[in-house]
Regions:
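Rossmann-like NAD(P)(H) cofactor-binding subdomain of soluble oxidoreductases
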Residues: 62-161
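Active-site-proximal catalytic alpha-helix in oxidoreductases
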Residues: 204-233, 237-250
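A structural signal for isolated positions on well-ordered beta-strands in alpha/beta enzyme cores
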Residues: 11, 34-36, 112-114, 142, ...
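NAD(P)-dependent Rossmann-like dehydrogenase/reductase catalytic/cofactor-binding core
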Residues: 2, 6-7, 240-334
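A structural micro-motif
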Residues: 8, 33, 111-112, 139-140, ...
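Helix-loop-beta segment of a Rossmann-like dinucleotide-binding subdomain
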Residues: 107, 159-171, 223-234, 284-293
Length: 334
């Protein structure tokens, strides 16, 4: 396999399913590719002296893929290499703190952040504020999104385990100025079986709103109903709830982006939500798993973001508010 054009070192912050999936996909396709996953301190013993982890990725009807992935501890002072290409794949509510923890290593003059979080529209606003405070004035924020379904199983002593539950697509937003560079980066991801493509920034913005709609519907409802995406459609009140949530997102999104009226129409958002469900029928959603593990959820960055923007615009969002408060009630018991 020919090497991709983009060969700059990549650092990945976020050792959950998507971050490890990205790292494993690239390293299994290109075993010597210069990347590293940054882990928090409590993973130090697992990483050990070898500074590598082993990841096993299982996919439907395919042989498992194994990869050795370089690993670093975020606050390890011996890791002094400058970070120029950062993939941020943490939980949305962890993103800002994660970036702040590595500010001394960020290249202030030439920093590219690939934002691959749920709730990235919300995260983007907060991230730009915090980077400005640290005098990183002109970072490239590359908005990314993926519909791949991936779940992380409990690790054993020797390796991490991932299961790909649905084959999706990955998109990366690019401007006229950086289209060629992002196209080369997307080629790397595509050759690593991530089904990746660089698209114009305006198209990416619409796609992020469509992904937000899918997350605002599927995440809280699968968590509340305790079921997979596929089983969700069999619940009697699913269609009515879905339509109300989507209508509110459409109202807010089109008010904020009048040039995207067609892409953010209720029918367009509904079609996208249904596509995501079909691509990930067996996926239980990250919010379902967070509730199951009694962990904090991303509800504030998803439905909460829609509610806050609606309040600013004078648009009521009762369906999103109902889901938001139901999830909050569940997590308040933890």
């Amino acid at each position: 396999m020919a090497l991709p054009f983009f060969m700059e070192p990549i650092h990945i912050v976020g050792s959950g399913s998507i971050g490890l999936f990205l790292a494993t996909s690239i390293r299994s396709a290109f075993p010597s590719y210069p990347l590293a996953v940054l882990f928090r301190q409590h993973h130090k013993q697992r990483i050990g002296n070898e500074k590598e982890i082993t990841v096993c990725l299982r996919q439907k009807e395919q042989r498992p893929r194994m990869a050795r992935v370089p690993a670093q501890i975020i606050d390890d002072r011996r890791s002094t290499s400058s970070i120029r290409n950062l993939v941020l794949s943490t939980k949305a509510f962890q993103a800002v703190d994660a970036v702040e923890s590595i500010v001394p290593r960020l290249d202030p003059e030439n920093l590219k952040i690939m934002l691959l979080c749920n709730g990235s529209l919300d995260v983007r606003e907060k991230l730009l504020e915090i980077l400005s405070l640290h005098e990183i004035k002109s970072p490239q924020l590359v908005m990314c999104t993926t519909t791949h379904g991936v779940e992380q199983e409990p690790p054993d002593e020797d390796m991490f385990h991932l299961v790909q539950t649905g084959m999706g697509r990955t998109f990366m937003g690019a401007t006229l100025e950086n289209m060629e560079e992002i196209r080369r980066l997307s080629e790397l991801w595509d050759r690593a079986s991530l089904n990746a493509k660089a698209i114009e920034k305006s198209k990416m913005e619409a796609f992020l709103w469509q992904k937000l709609a899918a997350n605002c519907v599927c995440n809280p409802l699968t968590a509340l109903c305790q079921c997979t995406n596929g089983a969700l459609t069999k619940h009697s009140n699913f269609v009515a709830t879905r339509d109300k949530v989507i209508q509110e997102i459409s109202d807010v999104g089109r008010e904020m982006n009048p040039d995207m009226a067609e892409q953010l129409s209720p029918s367009a958002l509904t079609a996208f939500v249904e596509l995501v469900i079909q691509e990930n029928l067996q996926n239980t959603s990250s919010m379902f798993r967070d509730i199951e593990k009694k962990q904090e959820t991303e509800i504030d960055n998803l439905n909460g973001y829609v509610i806050r923007k609606g309040q600013h615009l004078g648009i009521d969002c009762p369906a999103n508010e109902e889901l938001y408060h139901k999830i909050r009630e569940m997590t308040a018991k933890f």
